[in-house]
Protein backbone atom coordinates (compact mmCIF):
# COMPACT_ATOMS: atom_id res chain seq x y z
CA UNK A 1 0.00 0.00 0.00
CA UNK A 2 2.01 2.91 -1.35
CA UNK A 3 0.21 6.25 -1.69
CA UNK A 4 0.55 7.97 -5.08
CA UNK A 5 -0.67 11.42 -4.03
CA UNK A 6 -0.88 13.30 -0.77
CA UNK A 7 -3.22 15.90 0.64
CA UNK A 8 -2.08 16.77 4.16
CA UNK A 9 -4.53 17.70 6.94
CA UNK A 10 -3.78 18.83 10.47
CA UNK A 11 -5.86 17.56 13.39
CA UNK A 12 -6.34 20.67 15.53
CA UNK A 13 -7.37 18.54 18.53
CA UNK A 14 -6.86 14.92 19.49
CA UNK A 15 -8.86 12.40 17.47
CA UNK A 16 -12.03 11.94 19.57
CA UNK A 17 -12.15 8.14 19.15
CA UNK A 18 -9.76 5.20 19.34
CA UNK A 19 -9.45 2.54 16.63
CA UNK A 20 -12.19 0.34 18.09
CA UNK A 21 -14.69 3.20 18.40
CA UNK A 22 -13.75 4.43 14.94
CA UNK A 23 -14.46 0.98 13.52
CA UNK A 24 -17.90 0.95 15.16
CA UNK A 25 -18.71 4.44 13.90
CA UNK A 26 -17.66 3.68 10.33
CA UNK A 27 -19.76 0.52 10.36
CA UNK A 28 -22.87 2.73 10.53
CA UNK A 29 -22.19 3.98 6.99
CA UNK A 30 -20.92 1.15 4.85
CA UNK A 31 -20.46 1.42 1.10
CA UNK A 32 -23.36 -0.11 -0.82
CA UNK A 33 -24.51 -0.45 -4.43
CA UNK A 34 -26.70 2.22 -5.99
CA UNK A 35 -30.39 1.38 -5.99
CA UNK A 36 -32.11 1.52 -9.37
CA UNK A 37 -33.10 5.17 -8.97
CA UNK A 38 -30.00 6.41 -7.12
CA UNK A 39 -27.35 8.49 -8.84
CA UNK A 40 -24.65 7.93 -6.22
CA UNK A 41 -23.81 6.28 -2.90
CA UNK A 42 -20.85 6.73 -0.57
CA UNK A 43 -19.60 4.75 2.39
CA UNK A 44 -16.69 2.99 4.05
CA UNK A 45 -15.00 -0.22 2.96
CA UNK A 46 -12.19 -2.35 4.36
CA UNK A 47 -8.84 -0.98 3.16
CA UNK A 48 -7.41 -4.51 3.01
CA UNK A 49 -9.27 -7.74 2.37
CA UNK A 50 -12.88 -8.48 1.50
CA UNK A 51 -15.90 -9.91 3.23
CA UNK A 52 -17.79 -9.04 6.39
CA UNK A 53 -14.87 -9.97 8.67
CA UNK A 54 -12.40 -7.57 7.03
CA UNK A 55 -11.82 -4.64 9.44
CA UNK A 56 -12.76 -1.14 8.35
CA UNK A 57 -9.79 0.25 10.28
CA UNK A 58 -6.40 -1.30 9.62
CA UNK A 59 -4.11 -0.70 12.59
CA UNK A 60 -0.34 -0.84 12.17
CA UNK A 61 1.63 0.42 15.16
CA UNK A 62 0.59 4.02 15.77
CA UNK A 63 -1.04 4.39 12.35
CA UNK A 64 -4.57 3.77 11.06
CA UNK A 65 -5.63 3.16 7.46
CA UNK A 66 -9.21 3.65 6.27
CA UNK A 67 -10.96 3.68 2.90
CA UNK A 68 -14.22 4.92 1.40
CA UNK A 69 -15.89 4.00 -1.86
CA UNK A 70 -18.12 6.04 -4.12
CA UNK A 71 -20.47 4.34 -6.54
CA UNK A 72 -22.22 6.41 -9.18
CA UNK A 73 -24.37 5.87 -12.22
CA UNK A 74 -22.88 7.47 -15.31
CA UNK A 75 -25.55 9.04 -17.48
CA UNK A 76 -23.99 11.02 -20.36
CA UNK A 77 -25.45 14.49 -20.68
CA UNK A 78 -25.60 14.17 -24.47
CA UNK A 79 -27.90 11.14 -24.17
CA UNK A 80 -30.30 13.05 -21.91
CA UNK A 81 -30.20 16.15 -24.14
CA UNK A 82 -30.94 14.15 -27.29
CA UNK A 83 -33.84 12.32 -25.65
CA UNK A 84 -35.22 15.58 -24.25
CA UNK A 85 -34.99 17.33 -27.62
CA UNK A 86 -36.77 14.46 -29.33
CA UNK A 87 -39.56 14.37 -26.73
CA UNK A 88 -40.10 18.15 -26.79
CA UNK A 89 -40.27 18.19 -30.60
CA UNK A 90 -42.75 15.32 -30.51
CA UNK A 91 -45.06 17.14 -28.06
CA UNK A 92 -44.86 20.44 -29.93
CA UNK A 93 -45.65 18.74 -33.26
CA UNK A 94 -48.52 16.59 -31.98
CA UNK A 95 -50.14 19.17 -29.69
CA UNK A 96 -49.22 22.27 -31.72
CA UNK A 97 -47.99 24.21 -28.70
CA UNK A 98 -44.70 25.34 -27.22
CA UNK A 99 -43.08 23.45 -24.34
CA UNK A 100 -41.85 25.94 -21.72
CA UNK A 101 -39.08 25.59 -19.13
CA UNK A 102 -41.12 24.17 -16.24
CA UNK A 103 -42.53 21.37 -18.39
CA UNK A 104 -39.17 20.83 -20.09
CA UNK A 105 -37.51 20.33 -16.68
CA UNK A 106 -40.21 17.85 -15.67
CA UNK A 107 -39.70 15.88 -18.89
CA UNK A 108 -35.94 15.89 -18.29
CA UNK A 109 -36.42 14.45 -14.79
CA UNK A 110 -38.65 11.71 -16.19
CA UNK A 111 -36.05 10.83 -18.82
CA UNK A 112 -33.30 10.62 -16.20
CA UNK A 113 -35.41 8.35 -13.99
CA UNK A 114 -36.18 6.11 -16.97
CA UNK A 115 -32.53 5.86 -18.02
CA UNK A 116 -30.96 5.45 -14.55
CA UNK A 117 -31.47 1.67 -14.14
CA UNK A 118 -29.59 1.13 -17.43
CA UNK A 119 -26.74 3.56 -16.70
CA UNK A 120 -23.16 2.37 -16.34
CA UNK A 121 -21.79 2.00 -12.80
CA UNK A 122 -18.47 3.59 -11.84
CA UNK A 123 -16.72 2.85 -8.54
CA UNK A 124 -13.81 4.76 -7.04
CA UNK A 125 -12.04 4.32 -3.71
CA UNK A 126 -10.17 6.85 -1.60
CA UNK A 127 -7.68 5.86 1.10
CA UNK A 128 -6.58 7.90 4.10
CA UNK A 129 -3.95 7.33 6.77
CA UNK A 130 -4.41 8.70 10.27
CA UNK A 131 -1.38 9.38 12.45
CA UNK A 132 -2.87 10.42 15.82
CA UNK A 133 0.48 11.01 17.55
CA UNK A 134 1.63 13.31 14.74
CA UNK A 135 -1.81 14.93 14.53
CA UNK A 136 -2.11 14.27 10.80
CA UNK A 137 -4.56 12.80 8.32
CA UNK A 138 -3.04 12.01 4.93
CA UNK A 139 -5.40 11.43 2.01
CA UNK A 140 -4.19 9.48 -1.00
CA UNK A 141 -5.64 11.85 -3.58
CA UNK A 142 -4.74 14.99 -5.51
CA UNK A 143 -8.40 16.08 -5.52
CA UNK A 144 -9.52 18.26 -2.58
CA UNK A 145 -13.13 17.33 -3.45
CA UNK A 146 -12.44 13.60 -3.02
CA UNK A 147 -10.58 14.27 0.21
CA UNK A 148 -13.40 16.40 1.57
CA UNK A 149 -15.95 13.70 0.68
CA UNK A 150 -14.03 11.25 2.85
CA UNK A 151 -13.40 13.69 5.70
CA UNK A 152 -16.98 14.98 5.82
CA UNK A 153 -18.32 11.41 5.89
CA UNK A 154 -15.87 10.57 8.66
CA UNK A 155 -17.03 13.67 10.53
CA UNK A 156 -20.64 12.57 10.05
CA UNK A 157 -20.16 9.15 11.65
CA UNK A 158 -17.85 10.30 14.46
CA UNK A 159 -19.82 13.43 15.30
CA UNK A 160 -16.81 15.76 15.11
CA UNK A 161 -13.52 15.91 13.23
CA UNK A 162 -11.36 18.95 14.06
CA UNK A 163 -9.22 19.08 10.94
CA UNK A 164 -7.90 21.66 8.46
CA UNK A 165 -5.49 21.62 5.53
CA UNK A 166 -1.90 21.94 6.72
CA UNK A 167 -0.51 25.32 5.65
CA UNK A 168 3.02 26.72 5.63
CA UNK A 169 4.48 30.15 6.36
CA UNK A 170 6.04 30.70 2.93
CA UNK A 171 4.12 30.21 -0.30
CA UNK A 172 5.34 27.04 -2.05
CA UNK A 173 5.55 29.03 -5.29
CA UNK A 174 8.11 31.41 -3.75
CA UNK A 175 10.23 28.56 -2.39
CA UNK A 176 10.14 26.52 -5.61
CA UNK A 177 11.00 29.57 -7.70
CA UNK A 178 13.97 30.29 -5.43
CA UNK A 179 15.19 26.69 -5.65
CA UNK A 180 15.17 26.73 -9.44
CA UNK A 181 16.64 30.25 -9.65
CA UNK A 182 19.49 29.70 -7.19
CA UNK A 183 19.87 25.97 -7.92
CA UNK A 184 20.11 25.51 -4.15
CA UNK A 185 17.17 23.51 -2.75
CA UNK A 186 16.83 22.74 0.96
CA UNK A 187 18.98 20.02 2.51
CA UNK A 188 18.12 16.49 1.33
CA UNK A 189 15.93 17.81 -1.51
CA UNK A 190 16.96 17.58 -5.16
CA UNK A 191 15.43 19.39 -8.13
CA UNK A 192 14.62 16.97 -10.96
CA UNK A 193 13.71 17.63 -14.60
CA UNK A 194 10.10 18.80 -14.71
CA UNK A 195 8.31 22.03 -13.81
CA UNK A 196 5.47 24.37 -14.67
CA UNK A 197 6.10 28.10 -14.99
CA UNK A 198 3.35 30.74 -14.98
CA UNK A 199 3.17 34.48 -15.37
CA UNK A 200 1.94 36.17 -12.22
CA UNK A 201 -0.88 38.06 -13.95
CA UNK A 202 -4.12 36.20 -14.57
CA UNK A 203 -4.00 36.00 -18.36
CA UNK A 204 -0.27 35.29 -18.53
CA UNK A 205 1.46 32.45 -20.29
CA UNK A 206 2.17 28.96 -19.01
CA UNK A 207 5.30 26.96 -19.80
CA UNK A 208 5.44 23.24 -19.00
CA UNK A 209 8.85 21.62 -19.08
CA UNK A 210 9.46 17.88 -19.03
CA UNK A 211 12.80 16.08 -19.21
CA UNK A 212 14.51 19.48 -19.20
CA UNK A 213 17.65 20.74 -17.51
CA UNK A 214 16.09 23.25 -15.13
CA UNK A 215 19.46 24.99 -14.69
CA UNK A 216 19.51 25.94 -18.39
CA UNK A 217 19.56 29.52 -19.67
CA UNK A 218 16.15 29.03 -21.25
CA UNK A 219 14.52 28.27 -17.90
CA UNK A 220 16.40 31.08 -16.16
CA UNK A 221 15.24 33.52 -18.84
CA UNK A 222 11.61 32.65 -18.15
CA UNK A 223 12.20 33.34 -14.46
CA UNK A 224 13.91 36.69 -15.08
CA UNK A 225 10.92 37.82 -17.17
CA UNK A 226 8.60 37.32 -14.21
CA UNK A 227 7.36 33.76 -14.40
CA UNK A 228 7.16 31.73 -11.18
CA UNK A 229 7.36 27.99 -10.54
CA UNK A 230 3.94 26.52 -9.76
CA UNK A 231 4.86 22.83 -10.04
CA UNK A 232 8.24 21.21 -9.53
CA UNK A 233 9.50 17.64 -9.60
CA UNK A 234 11.69 16.85 -6.61
CA UNK A 235 13.43 13.98 -4.86
CA UNK A 236 13.99 13.61 -1.14
CA UNK A 237 17.07 11.77 0.10
CA UNK A 238 17.29 8.45 -1.75
CA UNK A 239 13.80 7.41 -0.68
CA UNK A 240 11.15 9.06 -2.84
CA UNK A 241 10.39 11.45 -5.68
CA UNK A 242 7.29 13.58 -6.22
CA UNK A 243 5.73 16.61 -7.86
CA UNK A 244 4.94 19.57 -5.58
CA UNK A 245 2.42 22.21 -6.62
CA UNK A 246 1.57 25.72 -5.47
CA UNK A 247 -1.17 24.45 -3.12
CA UNK A 248 1.26 22.07 -1.37
CA UNK A 249 -0.32 19.03 -2.98
CA UNK A 250 2.14 16.17 -3.34
CA UNK A 251 1.51 14.32 -6.61
CA UNK A 252 3.04 11.37 -8.43
CA UNK A 253 4.72 9.97 -5.33
CA UNK A 254 7.20 7.26 -6.20
CA UNK A 255 9.04 5.32 -3.54
CA UNK A 256 12.49 4.14 -4.50
CA UNK A 257 13.26 0.45 -5.05
CA UNK A 258 15.25 0.25 -1.82
CA UNK A 259 12.15 0.95 0.26
CA UNK A 260 9.95 -1.33 -1.80
CA UNK A 261 12.47 -4.17 -1.51
CA UNK A 262 12.62 -3.68 2.25
CA UNK A 263 8.82 -3.84 2.52
CA UNK A 264 8.80 -7.00 0.42
CA UNK A 265 11.30 -8.63 2.77
CA UNK A 266 9.43 -7.47 5.90
CA UNK A 267 6.02 -8.55 4.62
CA UNK A 268 6.70 -12.23 4.08
CA UNK A 269 4.81 -14.33 1.55
CA UNK A 270 1.21 -13.43 2.46
CA UNK A 271 -0.48 -10.65 0.48
CA UNK A 272 -1.87 -9.02 3.64
CA UNK A 273 1.59 -9.05 5.20
CA UNK A 274 3.01 -7.32 2.13
CA UNK A 275 0.32 -4.63 2.26
CA UNK A 276 0.82 -4.07 5.98
CA UNK A 277 4.62 -3.88 5.65
CA UNK A 278 4.48 -1.37 2.80
CA UNK A 279 1.92 0.79 4.65
CA UNK A 280 4.00 0.79 7.84
CA UNK A 281 7.24 1.61 6.03
CA UNK A 282 5.51 4.35 4.04
CA UNK A 283 4.18 5.98 7.22
CA UNK A 284 7.55 5.76 8.95
CA UNK A 285 9.12 7.41 5.89
CA UNK A 286 6.47 10.14 5.96
CA UNK A 287 7.38 10.67 9.63
CA UNK A 288 10.74 12.03 8.45
CA UNK A 289 9.77 13.40 5.04
CA UNK A 290 6.79 15.58 5.99
CA UNK A 291 8.53 17.54 8.78
CA UNK A 292 11.45 18.11 6.38
CA UNK A 293 9.09 19.35 3.66
CA UNK A 294 7.23 21.66 6.04
CA UNK A 295 10.51 23.09 7.36
CA UNK A 296 11.78 23.61 3.80
CA UNK A 297 8.63 25.64 3.10
CA UNK A 298 9.21 27.96 6.04
CA UNK A 299 7.54 25.99 8.81
CA UNK A 300 3.90 25.33 9.61
CA UNK A 301 1.50 28.25 9.68
CA UNK A 302 -1.12 28.09 12.43
CA UNK A 303 -4.17 30.22 11.58
CA UNK A 304 -5.15 32.72 14.28
CA UNK A 305 -7.83 31.47 16.62
CA UNK A 306 -6.69 27.82 16.42
UniProtKB/Swiss-Prot annotation:
Q: What is its main location?
A: cytoplasm
- Recorded GO MF terms: double-stranded DNA binding
InterPro entries per the UniProt record, alphabetical: RdgC
* Organism domain of life: Bacteria
Q: Which GO terms describe its cellular component?
A: bacterial nucleoid; cytoplasm
The reply to whether Cytoplasm figures as a keyword in the UniProt entry is yes
Q: Which UniProt keywords apply?
A: Cytoplasm, DNA recombination
Localization in the cell: Cytoplasm, Nucleoid
Biological process (GO), any one: regulation of DNA recombination
Similarity comment: Belongs to the RdgC family.
- NCBIfam families per the record? PRK00321.1-2, PRK00321.1-3, PRK00321.1-5
> In UniProt terms, what function does this protein have?
May be involved in recombination.
Name by which UniProt lists this protein: Recombination-associated protein RdgC
Encoding gene (name): rdgC
Amino acid sequence: MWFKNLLIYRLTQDLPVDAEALEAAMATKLARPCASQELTTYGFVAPFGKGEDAPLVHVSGDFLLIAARKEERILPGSVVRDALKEKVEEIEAEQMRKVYKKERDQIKDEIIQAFLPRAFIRRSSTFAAIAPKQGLILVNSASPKRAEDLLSTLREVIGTLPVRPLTVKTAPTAIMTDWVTTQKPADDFFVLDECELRDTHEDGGIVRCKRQDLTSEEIQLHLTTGKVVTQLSLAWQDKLSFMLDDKMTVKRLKFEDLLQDQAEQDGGEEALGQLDASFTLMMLTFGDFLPALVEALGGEETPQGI
